[in-house]
Swiss-Prot record:
Localization in the cell: Cytoplasm
Keyword list, A-Z: Cell cycle, Cell division, Chaperone, Cytoplasm, Isomerase, Rotamase
Function: Involved in protein export. Acts as a chaperone by maintaining the newly synthesized protein in an open conformation. Functions as a peptidyl-prolyl cis-trans isomerase.
Main location class: cytoplasm
GO CC terms, sorted: cytoplasm
Catalytic reaction annotation: [protein]-peptidylproline (omega=180) = [protein]-peptidylproline (omega=0)
PANTHER family: TRIGGER FACTOR CHAPERONE AND PEPTIDYL-PROLYL CIS/TRANS ISOMERASE, TRIGGER FACTOR-LIKE PROTEIN TIG, CHLOROPLASTIC
Keyword Cell division on entry: yes
The species this protein was found in: Ralstonia nicotianae (strain ATCC BAA-1114 / GMI1000) (Ralstonia solanacearum)
Protein name, as recorded: Trigger factor
Pfam families, per database record: FKBP_C (PF00254), Trigger_C (PF05698), Trigger_N (PF05697)
GO biological process: 'de novo' cotranslational protein folding; cell division; chaperone-mediated protein folding; protein transport; protein unfolding
UniProt free text on domains: Consists of 3 domains; the N-terminus binds the ribosome, the middle domain has PPIase activity, while the C-terminus has intrinsic chaperone activity on its own.
GO molecular function: peptidyl-prolyl cis-trans isomerase activity; protein folding chaperone; ribosome binding
Length: 449
């Protein structure tokens, strides 16, 4: 049989393989002999099953395995000898016509990696975001940290934690209510609750509901109409008007911690220094700015590379990546607590576009790295790990954690190499700086998902 690799198209190839039947039979008998030592059958002790019975039970299955194993081994020997870079997995089809009596023949069809051409990057226009952390941003962060440590105390009570006034619901208060809603006098699903709590002003409830609750005294009730929006998530009530009765059972005011030494210590500042606290917050925000601005620039660089790149993308690699994305989605759903995820059908087609971009980008990046001899230097990897470790309580332990596992180290090496590609493209392209506030930066990142 010829071992000439046939060209079927841009990336598609075919090679015909011949496997001697004698070799298959010899390997089949060898595997059955090994299997007979452990196989279990009713009426026989393990290892004492007659060979004829083992062959009758497992012979056909073992023979098929041997055929394809030998075909696969021959396939990879041929492609390696001829320097062919196989993309994805080959598909083997057993031939039935034009085959010698003493052979099994297979047609192996497969794809090869494409030639990748990277065009001129000089015309690419990129924007490098510049964001400065101001004292106002630090103050906002401190406010957020205070709200995360809020304590609620009953309104209308005296004492250290009482406000001494009336128990009247105000904006920012945490309220506990009973409510019941009806449409045309009939209660509806989800329209009734007892002991339901929420914070006024956070927007968790519809505006009309919050407005009706504001100003209520503890123990007081109110009847009011509420028009559900047409796009409301509850389809049974969307676009309809309900009548609600709400009763205020409890109202609590928010007590935010004071900005003092104790507050600073709660944030990990051992000596309670407010200056150190602010410096620490600034450092964390600047680290976040660096991460976000780099992500924005990296996205632009990847888009620029895809625009100037010319290549055909192997379908087999796209299909493999679709399956990876399906499994990633399944693990994500499991992590979120969704039941029966293993049996849930997740169509791979929904990831087709994403998978094609990922595969194409991977091929383009590999070509840029190879042609321009880019590499992740040990000192770059070390610096990146140390920078990452700074955000943890025990940086030295994080550094040991990275260097203690080759897989984690390889992931960091890939990250550094990708950064080097970004820097390489920026050196070739036209890059303009653009000022952006921290609020705008976080909003931009949020919009991108």
């Amino acid at each position: 049989m010829s071992t000439v690799i046939e060209n079927l198209g841009k990336l598609d190839r075919k090679v015909t393989l011949a496997v001697p039947k004698a070799e298959v039979e010899q390997e089949k008998q060898s595997r059955l002999a090994r299997l007979s030592k452990t196989v279990k059958m009713s009426g026989f002790r393990p290892g004492k099953v007659p060979m004829k019975m083992v062959e009758k039970q497992y012979g056909q299955q073992v023979e098929m395995e041997v055929r394809f194993d030998k075909a696969a081994r021959q396939f990879f020997d041929i492609t390696n000898e001829q320097g062919v870079k196989v993309a994805g997995q080959p598909r083997f089809e057993l031939k039935s016509e034009g085959v010698a009596d003493d052979q099994f023949a297979f047609d192996a069809t497969f794809e090869v990696y494409p030639e990748v051409k990277i065009g001129d990057l000089a015309g690419a226009e990129l924007t490098r975001t510049k964001t400065e952390i101001t004292d106002a941003e630090i103050d906002k962060t401190i406010d957020i940290l205070r709200k995360q440590r809020v304590h609620y105390h009953p309104r209308g009570e005296a004492g250290d934690h009482g406000d001494g006034g009336e128990a009247v619901a105000q904006n920012g208060d945490r309220v506990t209510v009973d409510f019941v809603g009806t449409i045309d006098g009939v209660e509806f699903a989800g329209g009734k609750a007892e002991g339901f709590g929420f914070v006024l002003g956070e927007g968790r409830m519809l505006p009309e509901f919050e407005q009706a609750t504001l100003g209520l005294k503890q123990g007081e009730s109110k009847v009011f109409p509420l028009a559900f929006p047409a796009d409301y998530h509850g389809k049974d009530v969307a676009g309809k008007t309900a009548e609600f009765t709400v009763t205020l059972k409890q109202v609590e005011w928010a007590h935010l911690p004071e900005i003092n030494g104790a507050f600073a210590q709660s944030l990990g500042i051992a000596d309670g220094s407010l200056d150190k606290m602010r410096a620490d917050i600034r450092e964390n925000l600047e680290r976040e700015v660096k991460r976000r601005t780099h992500a924005l620039l990296k996205d632009q660089v990847m888009d620029a590379l895809l625009k100037v790149a010319e290549l055909d993308v192997p379908k087999s690699l796209i299909e493999q990546d679709q399956e990876r994305l399906v499994e990633m989605a399944r693990r994500d759903l499991e992590a979120r607590g969704m039941p029966n995820v293993k049996n849930m059908p997740i169509p791979a087609e929904m990831f087709a576009q994403q998978a094609e971009r990922r595969v194409k980008l991977g091929l383009v990046l590999a070509e840029v790295v190879k042609v321009n001899a880019l590499e992740a230097k040990p000192e770059q990897i070390k610096a990146e790990i140390e920078e990452f470790a700074k955000s943890y309580e025990d940086p030295k332990e994080v550094i040991r954690w990275y260097y203690g596992d080759q897989q984690r180290l390889a992931e960091m090496e890939a990250y550094v190499l990708e950064n080097n590609v970004v820097n390489f493209v920026c050196d070739k392209a036209k890059v303009a700086d653009k000022a952006m506030s921290f609020e705008e930066l976080t909003a931009t990142q949020g919009a991108q998902g």
